[in-house]
């Protein structure tokens, strides 16, 4: 019986594996083409017969990127924005998720529903109101105009996701900690925080990518002070409508991708366990 069951499963398993492989190829091909174009000479990039390989790889595009005067500044600004968003949103989301899970108060369910509704509002619909808000707050042309909106948009998802991790921690564990003399602060940071850390990593990945790749807010809120621009804005330096430098665009995009890949490599184990744990709720 088991043998027949295995034989019936093989075609479906093979079809699933082939489908997964095809999806992986489709997803990875643009990344491969970006890196390939970054190493191609200008003549091959502009050729009317594109080829998925190059016989004469060149570092000229990367040289132009790093010789661009403000590129290092853009990189540092992106790092400051992304790290600030990750740290602040993770801490606030952890405390908020604990509050809405452990405490009983009026409008608690309404608040949770509002977290869900907030995720349905497109960012583009709020860009103009946010522009006037940042103008009135004196935050235009500052990194604060990028950090604050990203924190606001990342918190609903982070709180809702972390709520499942906090809920999975038995209340008996909290009671035992209090019986042993632990304060609420000690329980939060020494017991609960390590237990929900995989969830924090998972939410931090989404927050980091959103802040790192942001172009809309950077273009809308950084108007005149280019020293406050981020890496996505650096692509405009190489893209000119009359004479686009596609090699520079692809090289800059490749450099932009490296920190994200490093971040994924460092947190991949925690990320998998975090996404797996999020399914429980």
Task: Enumerate the language-model features and the residues they cover.
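A structural signal for multi-pass alpha-helical bundles of membrane permease subunits
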Residues: 6-8, 12-281
């Amino acid at each position: 019986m088991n043998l027949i069951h295995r034989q019936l499963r093989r075609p479906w398993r093979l079809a699933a594996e082939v489908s997964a492989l095809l999806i992986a190829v489709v997803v990875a091909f643009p990344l491969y083409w970006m890196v390939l174009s970054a190493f191609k000479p200008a003549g091959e990039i502009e050729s009317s017969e594109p080829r998925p390989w190059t016989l004469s790889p060149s570092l000229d595009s990367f040289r132009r990127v790093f010789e661009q005067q403000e590129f290092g500044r853009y990189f540092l600004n992106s790092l400051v924005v992304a790290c600030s968003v990750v740290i602040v949103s993770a801490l606030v989301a952890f405390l908020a998720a604990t509050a809405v899970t452990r405490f009983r108060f009026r409008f608690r369910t309404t608040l949770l529903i509002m977290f869900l509704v907030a995720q349905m509002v497109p960012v583009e619909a709020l860009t103009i109101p946010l522009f006037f808000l940042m103008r009135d707050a004196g935050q235009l042309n500052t990194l604060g105009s990028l950090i604050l909106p990203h924190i606001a948009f990342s918190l609903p998802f982070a709180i809702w996701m972390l709520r499942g991790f906090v809920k999975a921690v038995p209340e008996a564990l909290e009671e035992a900690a209090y019986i042993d003399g632990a304060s609420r602060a000690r329980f939060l940071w020494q017991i609960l925080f390590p237990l929900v850390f995989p969830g924090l990593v998972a939410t931090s990945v989404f927050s980091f990518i959103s802040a790192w790749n942001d172009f809309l807010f950077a273009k809308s809120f950084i108007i005149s002070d280019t020293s406050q621009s981020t890496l996505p804005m650096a692509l405009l330096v190489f893209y000119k409508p009359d004479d686009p430098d596609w090699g520079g665009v692809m090289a800059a995009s490749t450099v932009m991708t490296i920190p994200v890949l490093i971040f994924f490599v460092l947190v991949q184990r925690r990320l998998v366990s975090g996404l797996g744990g999020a399914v429980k709720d």
